[in-house]
Structures are given as structure tokens and as C-alpha cells.
Amino acid sequence: MSDALSAIPAAVHRNLSDKLYEKRKNAALELENIVKNLTSSGDHDKISKVIEMLIKEFAKSPQANHRKGGLIGLAAVTVGLSTEAAQYLEQIVPPVINSFSDQDSRVRYYACEALYNIAKVVRGDFIIFFNKIFDALCKLSADSDANVQSAAHLLDRLVKDIVTESDQFSIEEFIPLLKERMNVLNPYVRQFLVGWITVLDSVPDIDMLGFLPDFLDGLFNMLSDSSHEIRQQADSALSEFLQEIKNSPSVDYGRMAEILVQRAASPDEFTRLTAITWINEFVKLGGDQLVRYYADILGAILPCISDKEEKIRVVARETNEELRSIHVEPSDGFDVGAILSVARRQLSSEFEATRIEALNWISTLLNKHRTEVLCFLNDIFDTLLKALSDSSDDVVLLVLEVHAGVAKDPQHFRQLIVFLVHNFRADNSLLERRGALIVRRMCVLLDAERVYRELSTILEGEDNLDFASTMVQALNLILLTSPELSKLRELLKGSLVNREGKELFVALYTSWCHSPMAIISLCLLAQAYQHASVVIQSLVEEDINVKFLVQLDKLIRLLETPIFTYLRLQLLEPGRYTWLLKTLYGLLMLLPQQSAAFKILRTRLKTVPTYSFSTGNQIGRATSGVPFSQYKHQNEDGDLEDDNINSSHQGINFAVRLQQFENVQNLHRGQARTRVNYSYHSSSSSTSKEVRRSEEQQQQQQQQQQQQQQQQRPPPSSTSSSVADNNRPPSRTSRKGPGQLQL
């Protein structure tokens, strides 16, 4: 230390710690000349002693002015060393960097100034301290003192220039440092970081694109910054990187795709738009690299399809179509199960557009990878069934298409119909709201006859009789009114003529027995008029309830529609279709006379021509809907000399059918009685005690009143007593008839 003091005059030593900047500056200039002379003479030991003295007595001094003098002195030494400074940097730079965290803002300012002067001298040799300097500058960029920020900004610009010129800069060592600070929220630090990313990316020899996954998330995080300038800088940097990706032959799409998927769900609109735009480009460019990320990408796209921002919706739809058009196989790593899982989750979305696209994906996978989809059927089947209750008709129609695609296999067809019936049973509102839509669409997508036969088979063994009746009534109404089932109606019209119609009639009859009106409608459709009349005659008082009359009202109105045109035309020949008339009159007799349906049917029957009755015997008693040209080859159910209903026609044993109908109806009647009895007993048991108690109280009151009257009345004579007895109205006892018990 004495060597250092001998080399430095006392005045210089004293002025370095002076409170006046000018004195410190002059002392530093003198120190610079001293070091130059020592360098020229090659006295490296003295130079080291001088540096050591500046650090120990000045830079580390508790006095702020001493620390300021030490910093300016170290800068002066570096300038004096000039080209020889590199070998002393290990001594000079660390204390300057440490001063960046000094509590005194003026010391921090002079530290920036000192390091700036040092960097100007040593240039590229300065790189070995880059990470420490970068860390210090990152903190100084957010310094509370504006002067320190300004000085740090100047130093930062110089360091950037040095780095871009240097071939010693290590991007591999720098990236972890950058990544560690990318999530800092301070706006000044963010500007500092984006500035460095942009500068380094502009250097041809530095491959920032290869390290983009390490700091991409941080850049996206800045897109939602409150500062417009920071958002703009981050967006500019991202746009530049995206352009580089388009022009680069090799990019790590996978790691970045994971980040983009998360950012696509950001609450910030600008961030979502940028993320979905990147995903769109990745899907176009990524190719095989993205196969295993398709499920994650789809999970990000589907919600964006329903985004409130139109730009996001447009890009999301484009990306969705692009992704769906890619042809990949499970052997390439395409995970069908993962895609199905995403689609299943999105079926619960609150947005209709997202649910529709999720169903489109399931349908696409079913067409392209049927075997794999069926392996995961149990995972998605319940969700698909629940979707039948969706509030959107478009969603329901798409769900039915998916179900129809699955039901191409016989075992899945049966399973589908069973589950449909189960859902209708579990949710009564589903049958009311969606029943017609579901059944009609299933009849279009799958064979209508096949669907109705399967439904009939299932309902035939239904234990819940009320549900079976309701379901059959719904199916019957669909059968009578839906354009999609016109071929089925035509087939049933020939039930008495051809085998196919007969088999369908018998298949439906078994379950249609749950509803008298459905059976009557089926017979009218099949032109089995005698059997319809017999069914009407078999009805009892219990069957004619409000529900029955409502169904009858619907049928009467349907008779006036084009569907039953053939039936109305047959009324032109009442002699030939006597059983049809008897059936219609039977329905008329069941209707209340003041009802609209009664008036409609009565008006129709009034139009039946009477002249045909006189020729009825000549035409013959062919009372079915079978064409007369075929009559002599038929034996219609109503065309028997003895009107024997126990005969059969074309294999249809109507006697057995009638017995089957009555058996089912007896079950319904028994259940109705049980329900009424249960309701009666449950209500009477709760009130019987109260009624009994009330009666006892009334009897006690009557006895008390009678006693009071007897006490007040004078004793009667025998004459007056007999007169009074004659004038008194007869008692309940005197009014009892023969064999009547006294109450």
C-alpha cells in the first residue's frame, strides 16, 4: 500500500474523496497520467497496488464521497492502462458492478459512468462480465432515480454495441438469465428485456430462434401489459419471430405449441388473437412435428370458435378446418382417444358453435378411424346421449348423425335404441321437447322400419306402463304425421294384402297395445276396420278418461288431413266399407257432444252418401281398405258371414291380437285401480281420526241440547203426548224400510 501512496501524490489522494465533483475529476485525470507512466515503464506491481488501494480505501469506504472517488479513479486507471487494461479487469470491474446496488443514488450514477468509460476502453474484453453486467443493468433499468435510469440506458446501448460486434458472446449462457427475468412485471424491465431480445435477434451469428421456446411465454405475457408501448414492442418482436419461423427449415414446433395452447385461453383479447394466429401458422407449417399435440391444439381452438371477438373466431375456424383436413394415422402417433376426450369435454361448452364443432370432430373421426373410435365408445356414449337434451336443434341433429354412424353395427344399433328409451323414461321433458325430432331424424339416418320395430320390441317388455303408454302415443303421432315416415305408412296400408305390411303391423301391434287410441289409429292406417271397431267395443268405462279423450281429439283432427285422404274417399262407398262407418260412429259415440272433435266427425259423417247403402249387398261386404279387384281373393277381417272375429287374415290372427290388447289394458286398469286405492287410503288414514273425533263431539253436543229441552218442557199429558206424537215428523227409525238397518 505504501508503494501505491508513493506513486500517488497526497493531493490527488485527498481530492479523490472531495465532495466537489470538479476536484474529484481533476484528481482522476492526474491519476490517469500516473498510470500511463507506470504502464510505459512496465511497473505492473505498482499498478496493481494502486488499483487495490482504490478499491479498499475508496470503493469500499463507508463514506459516499470516497466511494464516488474510488469509482472515478478506477475508470481513470483503466483509461491510463489503455491496451493493457484487459489483464486488470478482474480487479477493476467487480467493485464497479457491486456499486450498482449502493444505497446512494449518486454512487449508482457514478458506477454507471465508470463502467461506461471502462467498457469504451476494453470493448470485447468486457464480454466475460456480460452476465453480471446484464443482471445489474436489468435492475438499474427500473431504478427509482431518473438520472440513474438515464445513465444505465447509455451504458446499455454501449454494451449492446459491444455484444453485437463481439464473437465471444455466449448465447447459451445468456438465455437462462433472460428466461429467469421474462416474467418480471415492471414495465421498465420489460422494455429492457424486449430491447435485448430484438437486438440479439438482429445479429446474424446469434440463433435466437433456436432458443425462442425459452422466452416465448414471457413475450406473450407482455402482450397484456397495461403500457401500449410495451405491448407494441412485444408484438413487433413476436411478428419478427413468426416470419423467421416461416422461412426456417427447422423449428421446434412442439415446445412452442404447448405455450401457444395455454395462451389461447388468456383472458386478454390481444393475447388470444396472437396465440391463435401462431397456432394457425403452426398447423400449416408444423406437419408431422405437431401430430402428438393435435389434441392440445384442438382444445385451444374449439373454445375460440365461439370467442366474442370476430377476428379470433375467423382464425379459429380456419385453423379448425385446416387441422381436420390433415390425413394422419394412429401409426403416426395420432391419438384418437385424446381427440375424442377433448371433443367430449367441449360438448359441455356453454356456446353452441363450440358444441357443434366438437360433434363434427367426433363424426369425422368416426368416418376416418371407425375402429379406434368404437374402442372409446363407452367413454363418450353417455355424453352423446346427454347432448340429445341440448337446447339447440342443430346440436341435437348432429348428435343424432353421430349416433347413426355408430349404430351402423347391429349391436350398437340395439344399444342406441335402448339408451334412447332409457333417456326418454328418465327425462319426461326430453320426450316432450325432443322426442319427435329425435325419432324422425333417426328414421331418416337409419331405416325407419328398423327403428320402429326395435322401439316396439323394447316397449313391449316395458315395466313402467305409464311411460310405455306415453311413448307409444308419441310414436303413433309421429307415424301418422311425419313426412319422413310416409313409406312406412304406405307399407302399413297394405297390411291385409302383402307380407311385409302384415309383419310390420304385427310387430307394432304388440307395443301399441299400451294405448287404445294408438291401436285404433294403427288399424285405421292398416285399413283393418273391423278390428278397429271391435277394439272400440272392448273399451270399458275406466278407459274413457281425459287422456283418452285428448288422444281421440287428435285422431279426429288427423282424419281431416291429407294422410287419411284414402279413408275419406272410402266413405263414398259405405256399403262396401261398413266396418269403417261403424268404427267412425263408434268414435263419435265416445266423444262429448259439445266438443269440437264431435262436431268435426259428425259433419264428416253427414257427407256420407246414402244411396250406396241400397247397393251394399250387391257390391259385397268387403269392408276393408283392400281394393275390390282383390276382394274375391281375400277374406278381410270384417267380411265374414258370421262376423266371426276369431278368424285370421294373411296370417294376422285378430282374435289373438284382441286378446293381447285386452291383457295389456287389464294391466293398465289394474295399475290405475291400485293407484286410486293407494291415494284413497293414504288420504283417509290421515283424516279418519279427525272425522271420528268430530262425530263424537257432535253427538255429545246433541245429547246436551236434548237434555236441556227436556228439562225446560212441562210434563205432557197422555192426550197431548199422543197428539204430539202424531204431529211429529217421522224419525229415521220410523222411515226405515223392510230389511233396512237402523243407522
Swiss-Prot record:
Residues 624-647, 670-743 are annotated as: Disordered. HEAT repeats lie at residues 45-83, 87-124, 128-165, 169-206, 210-247, 251-288, 292-329, 334-371, 375-412, 414-448. Residues 678-688, 697-712 have a biased composition (Low complexity). Keywords: Cytoplasm, Membrane, Repeat, Vacuole. The keyword Signal does not apply. It is found in: Cytoplasm; Vacuole membrane. It is a peripheral membrane protein. Component of the PI(3,5)P2 regulatory complex at least composed of ATG18, SAC/FIG4, FAB1 and VAC14. VAC14 nucleates the assembly of the complex and serves as a scaffold. This is Protein VAC14 homolog.
